Regions:
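Alpha-helical transmembrane segments of multi-pass membrane proteins
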Residues: 16-29, 206-211
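Membrane-interfacial helix-loop connectors
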Residues: 69, 80-82, 93-151, 321-406, ...
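Transmembrane helical segments that form the transport core of multi-pass membrane transport proteins
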Residues: 76, 205, 210-364
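Small-residue-enriched transmembrane helix starts and helix-helix packing motifs
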Residues: 41, 45-52, 58, 80-95, ...
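Juxtamembrane and boundary regions of transmembrane helices in multi-pass small-molecule transporters
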Residues: 1-8, 139, 143-195, 241, ...
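Helix-loop-helix hairpins and the membrane-proximal interhelical loops
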Residues: 34-80, 310-317, 321-343
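Alpha-helical transmembrane segments of multipass membrane proteins
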Residues: 60, 64, 96, 157-162, ...
Length: 434
């Protein structure tokens, strides 16, 4: 036996044996944690992959193929006007009702296209944090003070975090953007800006309305939109198809076949609209992979993002589910520990709320009922705001993917800035309104 050559395989084998030997199977909390991890993964796959992640992957792929890199550099690059760059990045979340994981393909798309780290991280934070529906729900259920504080804090946070990231990594980012500019010196705008704008608006419309949540009150505008969500989504899909035929040389007969398949699914299974949506995604993928060079490049880019992000997200969801469980359920960490640690308005309570929020996974809009339960269990208002500001923008799955895009150092800095600023905001809010 060659110890130098075989010590690593031997170590892995020994480690695996020890883990298997001492595996706490039969301990109720461990068994429950395994089930919670699998339940959360199932819930994530059913509620977020088809309608959230896959459309986001297609948008990210389109950004890298169809969006002019010079346009990205002009509006979001390191040398862009700060007012424009951070203004666009910080309020983008008011349009996108996405969670911390769905925003990742979009962030990866603009970052790789040459967006400066400041505007890119401002968008990364604001995407899930500045959600109009979530802010309205926060004000309605948790109180107007928390709702306003969340809205103002999220906008300010995104700008400040972006500026600090630019300040810390500005020199290295200049080298990256110069390299990007050099590789795109012959970049030409193939289509007018208004065509590109309408094209992306149609895809964003599909993403927004396919994920429109059911409101608590069965009346009013939000409920009307919810009752028509799939009709509206279908309208945006038809609009996208017409633009692809007119401007992107996609064959009309291929899109008509996909449309017939989707319509048949919707008519045959009216109570399961997700099946029709899935049929549309599959058909659309076939259209792209059998189309011209531009269409194939779009799908290749989309698939590239999926290969990078999917495994890390699923692994992160499993770990988060095992440690913390689903909302209303427990994993390895008892919920009593969490609720007892966030009472009052001490520095430690706010810090713990920020860290716990950063590692927990919140699906879109779920943070409000979770916080409602924690406030009822004695959580202070300061820690509640800290969790609201840190939670939706970060999660364990989200962190794993960000590291693969930006690197370890930038990811740790981004997470630290979010946690520290959320903690400070929580302390200040608790002192004023606690």
């Amino acid at each position: 036996m060659d110890w130098k050559k075989d010590r690593n395989p031997l170590g892995y084998m020994l480690g695996f044996f020890l883990v298997a030997y001492f595996l706490p199977v039969g301990w109720n909390r461990f068994d429950n944690a395994v089930f919670e991890a699998l339940f959360l993964l199932k819930e994530y796959a059913r509620e977020h992959v088809l309608t959230c992640l896959l459309p986001a992957f297609f948008i990210a792929g389109a950004i890298s193929v169809f969006l002019s890199q010079s346009s990205v550099m002009k509006y979001l690059g390191a040398q862009a006007k700060k007012v424009i760059a951070y203004g666009v990045a910080s309020v983008s979340g008011s349009i996108l009702a996405v969670c911390s994981c769905t925003v990742l393909p979009l962030f990866a798309g603009i970052y790789r296209m040459g967006a400066g780290i400041g505007p890119a991280t401002a968008f990364l934070y604001s995407g899930p944090a500045i959600n109009v529906l979530a802010i309205i729900l926060t004000a309605r259920i948790l109180g107007l003070q928390l709702g306003i504080a969340r809205a103002v804090g999220a906008v300010v946070f995104s700008i400040v975090i972006g500026l600090l990231m630019h300040l810390i990594y500005g020199k290295k980012e200049n080298e990256r953007t110069i390299s990007t500019q050099a590789s795109t010196i012959n970049d030409e705008v193939a289509r007018p800006l208004w065509q590109t704008t309408l094209y992306f608006a149609s895809m964003v419309g599909i993403l927004i309305f396919a994920n429109w949540g059911k409101p608590d009150v069965a009346s009013g505008l939000w409920n009307l939109i919810y009752s028509w969500k799939w009709i509206i989504t279908g309208g945006f899909s038809i609009l996208l198809g017409l633009m692809l035929t007119a401007w992107f040389d996609v064959k009309l007969w291929k899109l008509l076949i996909v449309g017939i398949a989707v319509t048949a699914s919707a008519v045959t299974l009216p109570d399961h609209p997700v099946i029709a949506f899935a049929a549309g995604l599959i058909g659309f993928s076939v259209v792209l992979t059998t189309g011209n060079r531009e269409s194939r490049s779009w799908f290749d880019s989309t698939f590239g993002f999926a290969k990078q992000i999917f495994p890390l997200l699923f692994a992160g969801v499993l770990i988060a589910g095992a440690l913390l469980g689903r909302p209303g359920n427990e994993g390895l960490i008892p919920s009593e520990w969490v609720s007892s640690a966030v009472g009052g308005n001490s520095i430690m309570a706010n810090l713990f709320a920020s860290i716990a929020g950063a590692f927990m996974y919140f699906a879109t809009l779920t943070e409000v009922p979770i916080l409602q339960g924690l406030l009822g269990a004695g959580m202070g208002k300061g820690p509640a705001l800290a969790l609201l500001l840190a939670g939706p923008a970060l999660s364990l799955p989200n962190m794993l993917v960000i590291r693969s895009i930006m690197g370890t150092s930038r990811t740790i800095t981004f997470i630290s800035l979010v946690v520290v600023m959320a903690t400070i905001s929580g302390i200040a809010f608790g002192l004023i309104y606690g």
